[in-house]
Amino acid sequence: MFTRIMVPVDLAHLEPLDRALRCAADLAKHYGAVIVYVGVGAATPGSVAHNPQEFAQKMSEFAEAQAEVHGVSTEGVAMTSPDPTTDLDPTLLKAVDQVGADLVVMASHIPNLTDYFWPSNGGTIAAKAKISVMVVR
């Protein structure tokens, strides 16, 4: 049913992603799918990496570690954006097509007052993606 599961990750904030990571791994095992972890970073130095090449290396290392932990096939893809905070949703939607995903599994957040003014990333991806999206809270 699914062959390529895209999982957006923020390497600077992995703890809140735990349930989504485990869910994606379970689905990948069930369907024999590959998990493609996608991270979006800036071209400028940040808390995770000093440059896009280092960020790509860290994404690959993260994917390899997840493959070992969960026993699934993985890939790590680093996307670069001039402003990841404001450009995250469009960049992730481009990644869906770029990696050939047929399912997105992503973490949600606890809803709060700001959701009335700014939509959540998961909600935006679910509304605009042409493939199935599972938002895990």
Feature locations, PLM:
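A conditional alpha-helix N-cap/helix-loop micro-motif detector
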Residues: 17, 56, 85, 114-115
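Charged helix-capping and loop-helix junction motifs
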Residues: 20-22, 53-56, 89-92, 118-122
